[in-house]
Design a protein with these regions (language model features):
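A structured beta-alpha segment of the ubiquitous adenosine-cofactor-binding alpha/beta core
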Residues: 2-48
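Alpha-helical scaffold segments in soluble metabolic enzymes
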Residues: 19, 114-118, 194-198
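Alpha-to-beta junction loops
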Residues: 23-24, 51-53, 237-242
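Active-site-adjacent "lid/gating" segments in soluble enzymes
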Residues: 37-182, 186
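Aromatic-enriched alpha-helical interface/lid elements that frame and gate functional surfaces
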Residues: 165, 169-242, 249, 303
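Short acidic-hydrophobic surface loop/beta-edge motif
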Residues: 172-177, 263-269
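Flexible, small-/acidic-enriched active-site or ligand-binding loops
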Residues: 267-303
Length: 303
């Protein structure tokens, strides 16, 4: 892998870019709509140079529509999609997700998927494609259950309702007595029974279908009565669908992830090395774990 930095407003650097485009399979750009056109690197221009090119434009709201030119970031895309409205605190304030869901799950991953589809299509037809990847659009498929429920019943779910938005005792985050937290998700009846038996939940509090609030409060009270270590020991070896809410530091040291080799890849730097970030690529497509150099390339070498 190599890299190059170009000033696309420079005539020489722009010519370098055009020379690379002539030989490229894929071009990915993440400017606001219209910027590549102003730079003289629109799809029409690149297609004229390279008819088979896969031209992937990743933007917030897409290449068309009334919101296409709006300045926005990940949080804004999640807000517009309705995703933020479904989880929050007891006062109804939406929670602040600490993951760039739109950038990764609604931007990079759909781009990769559509690029692969376009390459397959080109192998059959010889034609390239312009891929309009809108992060705002691609968050909506993640709400398939909420959208589906609304279409079927005429009422869309809101915060604190439904199976995965806080309306069920079987899909919750509960506090322990030492202020740690457990993610509890025994959705299926067989898991729910094992879970209830394990925490010795009274039979009168187990009918969460008829009395969801009472069941939720009973589970919360029970789990808050003992520390995390007690519950982890109690759940050991049982199919209860319970997992401690790890800190990032704890996740980094998790023996399961270590066994899976997620942090074995390292990148050489001028002052030593750094752990490479995990990527969702199957190990059969990657080099064995080890120390790798970071991408380097000087302008003169590329020009």
């Amino acid at each position: 892998k190599t890299s190059i930095s170009l000033d696309l407003k420079s005539a020489n650097d722009k010519q370098t870019a055009l020379s690379l485009i002539e030989k490229a399979d894929v071009l990915i750009e993440q400017f606001r709509p219209g910027v590549m056109e102003r730079l003289g690197l629109s799809y029409e221009i690149t297609k004229a140079l390279n008819p088979g090119i896969i031209y992937c434009s990743i933007s917030g709201y897409g290449q068309s529509g009334p919101a296409r030119d709006l300045a926005a970031h990940d949080l804004n895309y999640m807000a517009r999609s309705g995703l933020l409205s479904l989880s929050g605190d007891e006062h109804g304030q939406p929670g602040l997700p600490c993951a760039l869901i739109a950038d990764i799950a609604a931007g990079a991953y759909p781009a990769m998927m559509n690029i692969l589809l376009a390459l397959q299509q080109r192998a059959k037809t010889g034609h390239g494609a312009w891929l309009d990847i809108a992060m705002g659009d691609n968050l909506l498929p993640m709400l398939y259950w909420a959208l589906g429920e609304g279409e079927l019943t005429g009422r869309f779910p809101t915060m604190g309702e439904g199976l995965v938005c806080g309306g069920s005792a079987r899909y919750q985050i509960y506090r322990t007595s030492d202020d740690r937290y457990l993610s509890v998700a025994p959705l299926e009846e067989r898991f729910w029974k094992v879970f209830c038996d394990a925490i010795d939940l009274p039979m009168s509090d187990r009918d969460d279908a008829s009395h969801p609030k009472r069941s939720q409060e009973a589970v919360a009270k029970r789990l808050a009565s003992m520390p995390l270590a007690h519950w982890l020991a109690l759940f050991e070896g049982k199919d209860v669908c319970v997992q401690v809410v790890n800190t990032v530091s704890e996740a980094r040291q998790d023996p399961h992830f270590a066994d899976r080799g997620l942090f074995e890849h390292r990148i050489a730097t001028d002052n030593g090395s750094l752990g490479a970030l995990p990527v969702p690529i199957a190990s059969c497509f990657r080099d064995p774990p080890g120390l790798k150099d970071y991408p380097r390339r000087h302008h003169k070498e590329s020009a």
